[in-house]
Amino acid sequence: MNALRRHRKLDAIWASEPGWKGWTSSVNHSDLGRMFLVTALFFFLVGGVLAMLIRAQLATPDSAFVDAGAFAQFFTMHGTIMMFLFAIPTFEGLAIYLLPKMLGTRDLAFPRLTAYGYWCYAFGGAMLLVALFFGIAPDGGWFMYPPLTGPLHSPGINTDFWLIGITFVEISAICAAVEFTVSILKYRAPGMSLDKMPIFAWYALVTSLMILTGFPPLILGSVLLEVERAFGLPFFQADLGGDSLLWQHLFWLFGHPEVYIIFLPAAGVISTVIPVMARTTLLGYGWIVASALALAFLSFGLWVHHMFTTGIPHMGLAFFSAASTLVAVPTGVQVFAWIGTMWKGRPELHMPMLHILGFFVTFIIGGLTGVMVAVVPFDWQAHDTAFITAHLHYVLFGGFVFPMLAGIYYWLPLVSGRKRLFRLGELAFALIFVGFHGTFLAMHWVGLLGQRRRIETYDAETGWGVINFISSVSSFVMAIGLAMVLVDIVIHGFVAVRGPRHPVSYTHLTLPTIYPVYISVSAESLQINPDTHHVRQGTSSN
């Protein structure tokens, strides 16, 4: 009883104030994690609406649904929102919520830094939304290449909104990375060595180190471009002694590791969910950790992969082409470990497992097309076509959204404190899976036929009309499926009965959970089971 009383007193001390004041001033990791996730979901909805507008415009030849200027703003904001305001913040929110529970600590190392990071993210995102709603959104593409975005060709304030807003978002990500790194290295439960951590914590640590290394170049580039636009200093203007390729180097030093920064947290979700769904232990824990570290290291040697058509020397082309192919090896190690885990166990097709199977199909196709574009002659032909857009979506949607949907269905009972109730999940998954592949397989096809990305219309004589119509209809099917997931979450939140905060709430699955359900902060209340790498409470196996 004394321990339970201490637990209740600590809960009262750490609880946020009721009402809006508590919401805006909270430094509790659970509150901030939910705030990150809800905000990221809101931006995902905005980005999805923009995607539907883009596909509506491209559904038929010579369409006048939107004009060229609005179309440029839509595709720029769609890419910006999905890459900067949805993908990375979703990882941040998930890690902020879960890591203390996984590590056996009451909160992260610097709670106020977590709150500061959230409000930086919210402010940067709000700047971009304001620009969109007032018709002054950036229109230079989500990677904002100079000289197109320089003061000569973009004299308005559209680009400035992007540069300032994204800088705040990047600062937010760095705050989260510092938080995760310190918490994982210094705030683990007594007895939890690094080799006994939950696998998701390893992925969070590797991703955080990548953020700390990869995001400063983009912040530097954004500051330099804004200074050039505001004060006329010629960092990227070739006619004044600058170098426009400098921006590409700075951006892709961030941008290509960003792909793996997005993928690795999703891989952490998969490595967590598969053993539970298969009712066995994770195969190759050490190999998976090593492959994640190798993937992080190799990702910083690939940035010129996006610059094969810029006239760089042939020796550089050969090196980066080989490195781009080599990165498939550590990725393959993880995929084989996941397949081996399922083979060793007895997987059951609950909702998380369905989305993981969708991930396997989609991500493998994306990986194969990635090897294709790593070959320089093919990249010269496919560069800046719809093929590249489709490949990117296969890697990022397949490598991130499907695993995150699995994570939502897996952890939602833990977050909500309600028993599992998902009435639309199977139908939603079918619509998402079929709609996604219909959209982007068609986009691969039309890209190989020569359709450039970012064009707002095309002539009927090109023969692209039927393929684009199939792609657009499929995208709306996918959107309906994603909307049904949202409805499923709402139904769960309002209809499902209260229950224990169990991570999956599949009561017939008896594998121990990875969460140390502690009732005090004393060291003796937590024990580490060296055989299962799981935290145990007292003598119960939880």
Segments the model singles out, each with a brief description of its role:
Residues S16-L32:
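Cytosolic juxtamembrane amphipathic/interface segments immediately preceding
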Residues T507-T513, T532:
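Conserved small/polar residues in nucleotide/adenosyl-binding loops
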Residues T281-L283:
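Solvent-exposed interhelical
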Residues M1-K21:
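Short, Lys/Arg-rich, polar N-terminal cytosolic tail immediately upstream
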Residues V517-N542:
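Hydrophobic alpha-helical segments, chiefly the membrane-spanning helices
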Residues G33-M144, T159-L185, F200-V276, Y285-F308, ...:
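Hydrophobic cores of alpha-helical transmembrane segments in multi-pass integral membrane proteins
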Residues T310, W380-H383:
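Membrane-interface helix termini and inter-helical loops of multi-pass transporters
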Residues Y187-D195:
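Inter-helical turn/loop segments and adjacent helix faces that build the functional surface
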